[in-house]
Amino acid sequence: MLRDGNEGMSTIPGFNQIQFEGFWRFIDQGLTEELSKFPKMEDTDQEIEFQLFVETYQLAEPLIKEKDAVYESLTYSSELYVSAGLIWKTRREMQEQTILIGNIPLMNSLGTFIVNGIYRIVINQILQSPGIYYRSELDHNGISVYTGTIISDWGGRSELEIDRKARIWARVSRKQKISILVLSSAMGSNLREILDNVCYPEIFLSFLNDKEKKKIGSKENAILEFYQQFACVGGDPVFSESLCKDLQKKFFQQRCELGRIGRRNMNRRLNLDIPENNTFLLPRDILAAADHLIGMKFGMGTLDDMNHLKHKRIRSVADLLQDQFGLALVRLENVVRGTISGAIRHKLIPTPQNLVTSTPLTTTFESFFGLHPLSQVLDRTNPLTQIVHGRKLSYLGPGGLTGRTASFRIRDIHPSHYGRICPIDTSEGINVGLIGSLAIHARIGPWGSLESPYYEISERSKRVQMLYLSPSRDEYYMLASGNSLALNQGIQEEQVVPARYRQEFLTIAWEQVHFRSIFSFQYFSIGASLIPFIEHNDANRALMSSNMQRQAVPLSQSEKCIVGTGLERQVALDSGVLAIAEHEGKIIYTNTDKIVLLGNGNTVSIPLVMYQRSNKNTCMHQKPQIPRGKCVKKGQILADGAATVGGELALGKNVLVAYMPWEGYNFEDAVLISERLVYEDIYTSFHIRKYEIQTYVTSQGPEKVTSEIPHLEAHLLRNLDKNGIVRLGSWVETGDILVGKLTPQMAKESSYAPEDRLLRAILGIQVSTSKETCLKLPIGGRGRVIDVRWIQKKGGSSYNPETIHVYISQKREIKVGDKVAGRHGNKGIISRILLRQDMPYLQDGRPVDMIFNPLGVPSRMNVGQIFECSLGLAGSLLDRHYRIAPFDERYEQEASRKLVFSELYEASKQTANPWVFEPEYPGKSRIFDGRTGDPFEQPVIIGNPYILKLIHQVDDKIHGRSSGHYALVTQQPLRGRAKQGGQRVGEMEVWALEGFGVAHILQEMLTYKSDHIKARQEVLGTTIIGGTIPNPEDAPESFRLLVRELRSLALELNHFLVSERNFQINRMEA
């Protein structure tokens, strides 16, 4: 447990600490544990023995740097070397060599891995902890049925249940169950041992009849009976060694291995003293569990809450990597066995290096990082996103739940989450409640449990100590919430405070409190802790805000928030986007690409990140903050990164906002903005896209990168250099060639020119033609070329193609259709950009920058935005920044409102502007219509909230189709922007058009523009030469498809005309 000596002081732990600790545990303990399980191997004649010496393993320095691994699409990894020995027993000789086992991906300073040039992160998983759990359910008759569920380390489940006659059964499958006596006998206990080790032997004897005695008469009979019920085998199976192995593999290995954590939980729940290194289920465990189940039936003992965090364990990066390393060693073992037997068969002399290959380990880790659901591509939209992604907790994944089967109870907040899992920050949609986020101070304990820190309140010692409590321990203490921090120290003993005890919230006297919270942010995740005045918001809107802050785009001119919570500096520091001085010294050179530091007689060059692309195409860039000649100390910030200012997180801008309706343009949360935000680049961001092309060696010859591309217009090739690659700094438009490439292919006989046929006939020369396969800039990709990388991998074969990467930067101003949001879940789409002179203006003549809909506040109950808006106005006028911790009402009633009004009053006094704070309507002000100059009828709330521009931008979403591809079966246009798809006119849209009687438009939609093949071909020709489009004569392709499908069901669809003369109805019959 961590104890902090400083009285009443605690520091926020590093936000990436959980990832670092997990990877260190894998390197320090996991590797040794798995290598020690590697068996000694002998050949069939037992003449050669191979073994690994675990005591001496080495991890070599990485061969490449992180930056090079990203650009060259390689894995940032370290080679693992282990000493191995080969013993010849007949000659009594041993050959020892240090061999390469394989490459292990390394974690970098961000807590992430670089695999094939892509930043990836392994998130933590929450699983049901192995052990035994007792539940009670009502059967169809309304009678309580008690069950005990044993969960193995692999997630397999076995159930014990007790029926009305107090008989105990072990359920081995969904339909089959066997007597507890048969299970215990199959595990090696006889009847006397069973009766000696239970508390209720008379209950066990009560259902012991002659048939049961025969089943448990011997271990072989019990195993046969168990196997017959488990495998649902009919007849009379014969006892054999293979039958035992099959049962061991299918049942006992999967459902009876408890592991270290499961053994500890089993001992605690059943009051056993079995050694913790005995990790398998024993007959003694089964009998103790049955005793406890009988006690439950008689009303003794307590049932288990399966959703309590004390019954969960965290599967961290250490556990996942250790599992994969163990799997790789099993594969390596099979390879070594096969190599030994092959060498003996061919009478070769093996060496340790010849026996071991690095392929199993390398491929296993590459497969894990590429395919495992818990290994995800790092979201690097902004610095906050990077940190939050590594602190996620997921119930999904192997051995966990699925989004469709998880119940509401599992998704819901549990009292044990308090201080460990954020009750607010979770994903929206089908995974709500299944993907959470760690609270700020939470950490993973040695047994996989989540621990939260508290201050211990001791009567004997006045010194405050900080302890980390696990979910199973804090049940036994009275835990005071953050409200107790505000108590007057002199009269604490007389105060009554809210506290938590055994998952209940109580109000108790101060002297009864054992522990108290250490921090007002303790219960929330990083995203939720960055929301000012969060206590005034509805939790649903706070959830949206914590998700939307992760979607904020870094702006070209960042600005830190006027109103914050104080956590912004820590987030920026731990995100890794800042350049930090590693030791003190003097700056002797500074530039946009590097800073040179002189200290202790050594010169250190610190490279800066310049226009680096993130996974979400945002621009990561560092800007120097220290002038040349200045002395710096260790830990001082040398350069700001993307979305940081002065070492603080800066995701958005403080803009002047009015909450008022304006001609209906902010209907349904739409937002009006001033043209100032466009022309002054207030919300301008840079986005970098990567385009790549590979060159292969085909069967007709190698592909060629060249600038000489036939049959293409010259203006498309204008930006290519002599090698056929686009020049740095070129401005490129849609359709331009970025890389010129020709692919060789053999031409058909009929396509040869006469002179080619002559050459072929006389000289026998094979004439080949080339196909143009250039890299072209797709729609919406216009911009400036900022980098070109030509990566030539070793070998140069078709399996290692050369790759060319082209990076293009786009400058995007804010425009109609972009999404903006505040920090309180108030989001909206920009509906119109008004001229500055048309925007409403304040009494000092300043036009507002944005207009929000006031109806978005009362129904959403996110009143925190009003506090932030008004306090931001005071801060902008007084040139102040505020850092306010949440729940300030614990100090005084209406503390937030009093703070805002006092600051507005002071701003009004200092600026001599009485309109800033008017007592009749505090926080509001009379503003004027920019078009007419008349004041609006009602006073309006104005202020400077912090508004973010989100990554959902109209340039990435807007799409139109003139022509494109068609589906092969239905012949209708494809769906989606990526496939150049069309807009579907479905059944309900057809009804809408029918309602207006637009027959010709409807016919166009269903024929020419859709799936009438002949008619849509005629449209093109008619459009070029002019004239009317002919009506389609036959049915469209989708109707023909329906007819064909009916024929496949042996239904023939015919049509014929019924004349009025032959069309008669017998009205009497009808």
UniProtKB/Swiss-Prot annotation:
EC number: 2.7.7.6
Keyword Signal attributed: no
Stored InterPro entries: DNA-dir_RNA_pol_bsu_ext_1_sf, DNA-dir_RNA_pol_su2, DNA-dir_RNAP_su2_dom, DNA-dir_RNAP_su2_hyb_sf, RNA_pol_bsu_bac, RNA_pol_bsu_CS, RNA_pol_bsu_protrusion, RNA_pol_Rpb2_2
Reactions mediated catalytically: RNA(n) + a ribonucleoside 5'-triphosphate = RNA(n+1) + diphosphate
GO CC annotations, alphabetized: chloroplast; DNA-directed RNA polymerase complex; mitochondrion
Family: Belongs to the RNA polymerase beta chain family.
Protein's recorded name: DNA-directed RNA polymerase subunit beta
Gene source species: Spinacia oleracea
Gene: rpoB
